[in-house]
Amino acid sequence: MARRIRKSLFANPFKSALRALTQAAVKATRQAVTKASRKAVRQLTKPARRAAKPMARKVAKPAAMRRNKPTAAGASAGTNAGAGASTRGVALGPSGARRYLLFKPPGARKAAPLPLLVMLHGCAQDANAFAASTRMNRLAATEGFLVIWPEQEKLANSQGCWNWFDTRSGRAFKEAASIIAAIDQVCARHGADPARVAVAGLSAGASLAALLATRYPERFKAVAMHSGIAPGTAQSAATALAAMQGRRAPAALPVTLAGGGDAPSLPPLLVVHGSADAIVRPGNGHAAAQVWADASGALAGAPRTVQRGQRYLVTVTDFKRNGRIAASLCEVAGLAHAWSGGAASQPYSDAKGPDASRMVWAFALRQFRADA
C-alpha cells in the first residue's frame, strides 16, 4: 500500500504536466495550421484576381475592335490610330518566300491609289531596324505614301545581306524578281499606284535597288542608292568585297531586262554617299552616278555645296540630259557607312548628316510629278 501511495504521489504531477504539454502542443499546431492555411489562401487568390482582369478585358471587347501592338516600324511613325498602321505580309517569288513589312498612312483605304516607296535594308539589319533608323514611316504618315520593307531571309544569306552581287549564278536576279512579286502584291491588295513606285536602299539594299532599276526600268519612277555599289561592278562574293574597297568599277551599266526587248529609259538615280565610308568606299558613289549618267547620255553640271545648320556639308553634282536629271550625286562630308540624318540610337545611322529620308522622298516626288 505504501508503494501505491508513493506511485500516485509521483504519477499525478507527471500526468498533469504531460496533459498540459499536450494541450499546449495541440494549440500551437492549430495556430500554425490556421496561419499557414490563411497564407496559402491569400497566395492562391491573388493570382486569380490578377488573371481575371485581362480576361475580362478580352471578353468585353470584340477581337475586331482590339488594336494590335504596333511594331517598331509602326512606332517610328507614332502609335496612335492617326499615325497609320504597319502590317506583315509574305510574297512568293523565284527566290522563295520573302516577308515584308508594309506601312499605310492614315486614310490609306479611303483615299485614291497612293505612291509606293520600296525600302531595302542593309546587311545585319531587318525591316524593323531599317524603319527605326530611317524613320521613313513618320514621313510617309505626313506625306501620304505607302512604304514596303522587304526582308532578306537568313537562310539565303547568313548576314542578312541581299545577294545583289551574285549575277553569275542568277541568284541576284531571282531576289530582284521576288521584290517585284512583293510590289505586285501590295499594288493589288493595298491600293498602291503601280505608276508611282520608287525604290531605295542602304548598302547591300542600295545595290539591289539599282539592280532592280536596270532589270525592271519600266516599273520605277526613281531609284535611290545610299552607300551602295552600281550593277556590273561585281559578279561574286569575292569581287563584291573588292568592289567595296574601291578596287573595281563597272565599265558600263548592264541593263539586262527581265522580259527581254529594247531597254526603256532608266529611272533617275539619287546617290548619297559619305566621304568617311570605310566599308563601301566613296569612289563607289562617284562610279554609280557616272555610269548611270553615261547610260542615259547625261552630262555633269557644276558641283554646289549645301549645309543646313550644324549638319554635315553636302556637295551635290547633277547629271542632266535635255534639262532633266538622270543622276544626282550627294557627297556627305564626314559621313561614315550610315544612313544620313537617321535615328541616333540605331546602328548604321548618323543623326548629324542631312536627312536622307527627306532627300529620297523629295527626289521621288519630283519624278512622280514630272511624269504625271
Spans of model-derived segments:
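Cap/lid segment of the alpha/beta-hydrolase catalytic domain
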Residues: 151-174
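Short glycine-enriched nucleophile-adjacent loop
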Residues: 206-218
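Active-site glycine-rich loops that stabilize anionic/oxyanionic intermediates
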Residues: 114, 122-126, 335
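Short beta-strand/loop motif that positions the catalytic acidic residue
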Residues: 271-273, 277
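A domain-start/cap signature at the N-terminus of enzymes
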Residues: 1-116, 128-134, 142, 146, ...
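Active-site nucleophile loop of the alpha/beta-hydrolase fold
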Residues: 152, 224-233
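Alpha/beta-hydrolase active-site loop
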Residues: 168-190, 211
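Alpha/beta-hydrolase fold nucleophile elbow
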Residues: 191-203
